[in-house]
Amino acid sequence: VLLYLPGVVGIWFFVYLCNAWAFQILVNTSDHDKHLSFAHAFKLTVSGFAFSYTTPFGSGGAPYRVMELSRYIGTPRAVSSVALYSMMHVFSHFFLWTTALLAFVIAHFDVMTAWLWTLFAIFLTVFVAAAVFFSYSYKHGIIARLFRLLFFVPLLRRPARRFYERHATAFDTIDANIRFLYEHPRQLWGSLAAEYLGRLLNSFEFYFILLA
């Protein structure tokens, strides 16, 4: 067991390097004149995930990143950057799962049954739907649309509407920053590639655990 412990723990250093790289790309792909260094991005990445792992429902990481980043690039851009990274982090998981399924099909094609093909087709449908959703979100912005869903929640609709009306400009700025990334596909795909690489490296943690 101890033989594989350095691998289980040490792999996270490289995972966080990829996460920080993706985060840095997203923060620096904006119309502000600030440049987030990789060291600063790495610090926010590691400490942000630490907050996520130690707070209920992993809710502490994103607010912490926004709070720290807002001192550097302002609150609207900080919110949009953190929201973009959260979306990219989730989207990269879909690519990892798709890679795993394709590898399984290629390696075990001769044992694929109708039931397994059905499950594979269902997942591909979900993957395509997720890709369409994220593409639409990046192209049109999504923060304001998601917040307006609170208008239909009892007890929350009135305070949510008042909050939205007071901060409408900030919501527009956040979504404008999200749309700005969509107009720069090189950075968009670069960030996704970095997150995807991080997910691949993260899978080695489970591999080392199984070997142990």
Model-derived segments and spans:
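Transmembrane helix-loop-helix hairpins in multi-pass inner-membrane proteins
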Residues: 1, 48-158
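Predominantly cytoplasmic-facing regulatory/coupling regions of multi-pass membrane proteins
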Residues: 1-46, 113-212
